């Protein structure tokens, strides 16, 4: 991951999930070193994590089973 770029982290039950600005200007959802998807804004990416629609099976399968998922990017830790 390149330094100096905006990045957020959510310490989830499956491990850390990051939202990071990618080299193409989009924002990616990263877990275990894999970019699972990307969106035009970090808020849109945070919404996808909240809704469990990321393409990451380990995360998406927990839909309805976790009740403290950040509902807004402002609830993510800036790193």
Where are these predicted regions, by residue range?
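Mixed-charge, Lys/Arg-enriched low-complexity segments
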Residues: 2, 36-79
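Short, hydrophobic/aromatic-rich segments at coil-to-beta transitions
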Residues: 2-9
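Short aromatic-glycine-(Arg/Gly/Cys) micro-motifs in beta-strand/loop hairpins
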Residues: 11-35
């Amino acid at each position: 991951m390149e330094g100096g770029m905006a990045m957020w982290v959510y310490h989830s039950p499956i491990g850390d999930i990051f939202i990071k600005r990618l080299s193409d200007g989009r924002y990616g959802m990263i877990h275990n070193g894999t970019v699972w998807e990307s969106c035009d804004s970090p808020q849109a990416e945070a919404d996808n994590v909240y809704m469990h629609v990321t393409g990451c099976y380990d995360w998406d399968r927990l839909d309805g089973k976790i009740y403290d998922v950040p509902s807004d990017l402002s609830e993510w830790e800036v790193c």
